[in-house]
Amino acid sequence: MVGDKAQSLSSEKVLYTEIGHATPIAVAMVAAFPPPISGQSLAADLLAKGLESDGDFVVFKFDIAQPIAGDPLLKRLFRLCRVASSLAWCCATHRHLVVYLQLGHGTKALCRDLVLMAIAAAPRHPCVAHVHGSGLRKALDNMPKALRQLETIALKQLYRAIVLSDNLRVMFCDILPEDRIVAIDNGIDPNFIKLCNDAHRPIRDNIRILFLSNFIAEKGIFTLLDAAKMAQEAGKNYEFVFVGASAKTIDAPENAVESYMRTHGIENVEIYPIATGEEKHAHYRDADIFILPSQYEGQPLCIIEALFEGLPVITTRVGGIPDIFGSSTCVRYVDVGSASQIVGAIDSLASKQIRDELAHVARDIAWSRFTPEKHVEAVKAILRGAYFS
């Protein structure tokens, strides 16, 4: 199967070369762009920059990002109408165009995407859908029957569906044939990679465990707080560092994390706001272990960033995460919601010698699969194939 897919993509590149088109490939990129910062928006930004830097492509951006806290319904509908009308105009005024659509994960997002796929289908432009998560099938199954049938019909018209790993192909089972479902690994911002190096972490008495994600229950943050409390009560010299969206910007009770810490007397946790650039890099460099005990995931960029930084990872076997590591030794898996297993996993990585040995394993995984060049080139091949289909 892998060989067949490689041969297919190779054929698409040959076709592109033989035609020798005089104008760039036009791509209508309908996706969530920063802000706000999320795995989806960072992935879209990376791809857009990669396409824009290539003279063979011209990109028209249509931003479907929503604030984490959400907006009133009327404001959301107005934004959708504006994007839909702009996309319709773009599709109508370009004879040859590929629509790249970043599919949503929820029922409301899929209703939005149904409208956008219909706009692309009207002038028969090929559509490539990219799913940066693992919840699409659940959201589809939760839709009312009539809407689910319409959504399924629209998805069946896709030229290709891109998922993040082989484990996530199941989202399109019974909708698309296997050869129209493509697994492409995420890529990391090249500016972040430039800051990474192979330096060993300093010798110190305590162990710093980094959580870098949104402060929401689905990311396992309250389970991690319970683990921090257990470590504190056991007298373990573990320091937990939380970096992410503050409570007032997410759909959760205000100051939920800080309130939880006060209520339970947790004193071994440091909290920092969202970090970017060198500031984010510094958090990784100052950590000994990275942790993300999520309830569900696609292929988290923060885990891949941690691998580039040479950090061992504690996480859950959800979504596409197991495909990141395979049989690697640089990961410790815990069950969703198990604070005691988190403490045990940290205990297993308490030796600095072990962590230093695993750093090489982590970096090998990152550099072999998750560079921005590998990601962008793989998506380009799909877009070329769609353009000349």
Language model feature labels by segment:
Residues 327, 331-339, 348-353:
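Conserved acidic donor-binding segment of nucleotide-sugar-dependent glycosyltransferases
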Residues 274, 282-287:
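Short alpha-helical donor nucleotide-sugar binding micro-motif in glycosyltransferases
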Residues 295:
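Aromatic "clamp/platform" in nucleotide-sugar-dependent glycosyltransferases that forms part
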Residues 354-369:
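A short, well-ordered alpha-helix in the C-terminal region of glycosyltransferases
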Residues 312-315:
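Short hydrophobic beta-strand element within catalytic cores of glycosyltransferases
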Residues 28, 200-229, 240-243:
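Conserved donor-binding/catalytic core segment of Leloir-type glycosyltransferases
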Residues 239-267, 278-279:
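Short, structured helix-loop element that forms part of the nucleotide-activated donor/catalytic region
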Residues 150-195, 204:
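Donor nucleotide-sugar binding/catalytic pocket of nucleotide-sugar-dependent glycosyltransferases
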